[in-house]
């Protein structure tokens, strides 16, 4: 029922979301469709008869003292996704189930040392929870799996999946065992993980902690632990319960959901192109290499920018190069995610046309692109205002080349003695003198002509 989970103060809190007396829950149809879409994309079996249960527990972020969830008949079961790690390992990770539930509030622990705050803005917000099989054996595999799920969900439009904002969360259950041991060890659950890097560090930290306990002859306690990424350590929050401790029973206020074949067919027909299909199309339709196609589709937002820029400019390889080289460089410098890019695709398309039509050269274009990237500048207006158009006045270029050659007689002599690299130096100095605005082909031609003719 809550319209959003992001706000200051309890601005989005509703009576039904916090279980106020007299309020009754209402099923959000959209979350059912999102759950079906994700389940289909993750190769799940759809439960065409599913229902809701109450998970009973007391905690400050849960004013109802129960959470509406699905234990016995979740919407999806028995799925899988294929992953590939950065080191090249390929494997299939099973999905035990996908269920729908309502979100709890958010506890804020780091504002004051002696108390915690409770934010109920996200209480009652519908979410889907993906329960994974214990198939992953390293932090690298976990990150590859989460990245795969994030891309699926983003491409489906079910969520923007921003960990730092809480629209995607991951609780990591981890245990260790001796090599060859048939049974899993005692697991702990790690919370407060708001980035993939934090997840990887938490996994490594908890792995070391559990191994140290066992090597010292102590037991691992089944508990929920809170990860502190600044200290790179965790502390116990509460004991970890099993399902029977929550005293699940069917929610009496919500009727079962019957999912017809026709409903599934409608959801399937609306499924958008996912990353795997997009990679194949980029290679076939645009002639992009595998690496380029993978990088451009590693974010739905990046793929959208690429496709729209290509549509406007008609130059897929140029659009790809600007995004893969310059945009990636600037994102790294500013510690940005692809989803943070906000410039207009029409501006990037205009820049591509300006380079193609030799209105500006590539050196200047890089400067202009930075303005587009940082401030969404109109490239045509920016070039005009700053006098950055390519200088094609042969007389002015010839005079500049002569001045550069006169200032560098040793390079002129080196070239005439057979050292071809000296010409590159003179071209570079000319471009520098022209502040990058000269036509490189004209500069090359004039330098070669003047060196050959001895007219310096």
Residue ranges: model-predicted function:
Residues 1-2:
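Short, well-ordered junction/capping motifs at the entry into regular secondary structure
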Residues 5-273, 290, 311-315, 328:
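Basic, nucleic-acid-interacting segments
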Residues 38, 206, 309, 322, ...:
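Amphipathic alpha-helical segments in well-ordered regions
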Residues 120-125, 163-170, 179-182, 390-456:
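C-terminal non-catalytic interaction appendages of large macromolecular assemblies
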Residues 142, 293, 319, 365, ...:
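Small-residue helix-packing motif on alpha-helices
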Residues 166-178, 283-305, 316-333, 346-348, ...:
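Core structural elements
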Residues 312-313, 319, 327-342, 350-355, ...:
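M16/insulysin-pitrilysin zinc metalloprotease superfamily fold
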Residues 338-349, 353, 359-432:
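Strongly charged, low-complexity linkers/loops
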